[in-house]
Amino acid sequence: MSTKAQKAHYDRLARFGCILCYKQGNEGTPAEIHHIRRGGKRSDAPVIPLCPYHHRGANTSIHGMGRKRFEREYATTEEQLLKLVLQKIR
């Protein structure tokens, strides 16, 4: 279950827009919340904002390509995107 603080954080990230689009020079793309899973509970996982294209697209997204191919294709890691978005929303 999400806390009020988690919901506020997720809302702030979604308002920022897709962090990968931002990195590519396209600011403000509507975003969904992507949980970075490294074991443990999903509710405890760090999250990044990704647009539907980069989140769920068949051959363009983290879920469509898998993490390793996604990171290779876009020359960045989930952790690097997390660090970037946290810097930008502060």
Language model features with spans:
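Short cysteine-rich loop/turn motifs with clustered Cys
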Residues: 3-32
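Divalent metal-coordination and catalytic microenvironments
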Residues: 13, 35, 51
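Cys/His-coordinated zinc-binding microdomains
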Residues: 22-23, 52-55
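A broad, low-specificity signal marking well-ordered, structured residues that form hydrophobic/aromatic
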Residues: 31, 48-49
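Helix-loop segments that flank and shape redox-cofactor active sites
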Residues: 31-39
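Intrinsically disordered, low-complexity cationic segments
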Residues: 33-34, 53-54, 62
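Polybasic, low-complexity binding patches
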Residues: 39-48, 56-90
